[in-house]
Amino acid sequence: MEKEVIAYLDNETIIDSQSVKNTNLKEIYFDNSKESLEVIRHSCAHLMAQAIKSLYPEAKFFVGPVIEDGFYYDFRVESKIGEEDLVKIEKKMKELAEAKIEISKYEITKNEALAKFQNDDLKQEVLLRIPDGAVSIYKQGEFEDLCRGPHVPNTKFLRFFKLTRVAGAYLDGDEKREMLTRIYGTAFADKESLKEYLTIIEEAKKRDHRKLGTELKLFTFDDEIGGGLPIWLSNGARLRSKLEHMLYKIHRLRGYEPVRGPELLKADAWKISGHYANYKENMYFTQIDEQEYGIKPMNCVGHIKIYQSDVRSYRDLPLKFFEYGVVHRHEKSGVLHGLFRVREFTQDDAHIFCMPSQIKEQVLEILAFVDNLMKLFDFSYEMEISTKPEKAIGDDEIWEVATKALKEALDEQGLKYGIDEGGGAFYGPKIDIKITDALKRKWQCGTIQVDFNLPSRFKLEYTDSDNEKKQPVMLHRAILGSFERFIGILTEHCAGEFPFFIAPTAVGIVPIGEAHIAYAKEIQKELLELNIDSEVYEKNESLSKKIRIAEKQKLPMILVLGDDEVAKRSVALRDRRAKEQKNLSLDEFIKLVKEKMSEVHF
């Protein structure tokens, strides 16, 4: 079936073969291309729904979209569905696929659809979100559902799929509404690709940062504190602190000035910025002395006020402010996920105020910063430019100038990039930095944004060489995105085996007996003076148990100290990363760890 056409491509729009006949549009073949997988997975979501309806006749369905690497469907059933039920649902799906059922499409008006599904409250919910006009329905056998498509023309194309997990999901992501059942799955065009993906999924489960965060005692969450509010334990706080200190030095070397703005600002400031009108639903507000205040979801307004605190000349530009800014954003509880999606997080945020002629130069410098940092952590990455969304501030000309500046910088660096039409923030176009981890998964992290809008709204000025007042350009920039998300990604990328220079505990020191503890603590103190954290395992336990405990913590290095080491002032080193054991003098060991720490270059 590799050469069979399953859909067509009209510019960026995928159109299924049920909708188009005798076309000159680009053909989408049955394979593992991005467009083909979107059609296959969308169709497989309906195949799963058809199987569920067959097994659970009372089932009612909400939405079943394609997501990164797969699909899901939210639905309501009377009985509880668990992981053990996925096998029988898969079995029914295979039966339906083997039956080679034709998939057809027809259209009715919205009013006709409301009447057709009058006894289905979930379908009524879906129809409320659909604009007036024609509504498309896809039918396969006795099963039919509202859908924009596209779908494959026959269930025979849906052979290589896997249901991966079952979960609860609040209706429309609102925790105040009922909990529906959600089943996730994936699908491919061939058996080998599915097998490869499932292998990655199994490895991802072992690397899950929520699991490793607990095992390595990095962070925790507590219902009494609230969802999406991470609590950093000692190990996690040390890891984060090392990352923060390293980035602080890098920023200073690149000419950034540290600043700090308040976390609570009057609503008036958010009205000027446009956040109040365009981002209010994502913010938290309170009343103080009968005035409305908003907790900041972004750091830009504080940095603007720092810019306005002094008279600025063209000789001062570019001005580069950076802050580890704590921000809060309202997220529905249904989308919270470990450190990846939280309500409070800290951005490695910077804002650069410059002249229009300096935009490309500054973006190029940021791109070099990104490249150095990603190489340090062994991440590959790609760039994507997001353009003007439907809901935006500023006229088209301003957006065009800003978007062009980003493209020119990327072109000059020779970097390939994609275009996300309409994916920009409401106040300007942006470059999204997407990193690829050890499991070949892509993650959205940092951003670079050009902003002509906020300088205009806040009436920012500088005096040019002709002594005339001009408006600066503002560049928003975060490279990691947030410490929380990046640490979550890094944890999974390296499976909890952090690089030596940021490992929360870089060295485990194991004295064999009580007589060796004093020497162990002497080494610990010397390491701490080098900003290297270590732990002495001094409990009255067997040597093998102490080593096993240290190994479970995935420490880069373990030192074993006995009579011989104390007498010779040496160490027995187990290097987890180099996978070797050797004896070194203490001086040689200290020299080794100094070299490890000096490997971080910028």
Swiss-Prot record:
InterPro entries reported in the protein's UniProt record: aa-tRNA-synt_IIb, aa-tRNA-synth_II, aa-tRNA-synth_II/BPL/LPL, Anticodon-bd, Anticodon-bd_dom_sf, Thr-tRNA-ligase_IIa, Thr/Ala-tRNA-synth_IIc_edit, ThrRS_anticodon
Keywords: Aminoacyl-tRNA synthetase, ATP-binding, Cytoplasm, Ligase, Metal-binding, Nucleotide-binding, Protein biosynthesis, RNA-binding, tRNA-binding, Zinc
Enzyme class: ligase
Cofactor(s) it depends on: Zn(2+)
Binding site for Zn(2+): 300, 351, 476
Renumbered residue ranges of the record's region Catalytic: 208-499
PROSITE patterns per UniProt: AA_TRNA_LIGASE_II
MF GO annotations: ATP binding; metal ion binding; threonine-tRNA ligase activity; tRNA binding
Co-factor remark: Binds 1 zinc ion per subunit.
Subcellular location: Cytoplasm
Documented EC number(s): 6.1.1.3
GO process annotations (BP): threonyl-tRNA aminoacylation
Reactions mediated catalytically: tRNA(Thr) + L-threonine + ATP = L-threonyl-tRNA(Thr) + AMP + diphosphate + H(+)
Assembly and oligomerization: Homodimer.
Classification via PANTHER family: THREONINE--TRNA LIGASE, CHLOROPLASTIC_MITOCHONDRIAL 2, THREONINE-TRNA LIGASE
Family indicated by similarity: Belongs to the class-II aminoacyl-tRNA synthetase family.
Protein's job: Catalyzes the attachment of threonine to tRNA(Thr) in a two-step reaction: L-threonine is first activated by ATP to form Thr-AMP and then transferred to the acceptor end of tRNA(Thr). Also edits incorrectly charged L-seryl-tRNA(Thr).
Record-given protein name: Threonine--tRNA ligase
The organism of origin for this protein: Campylobacter jejuni (strain RM1221)
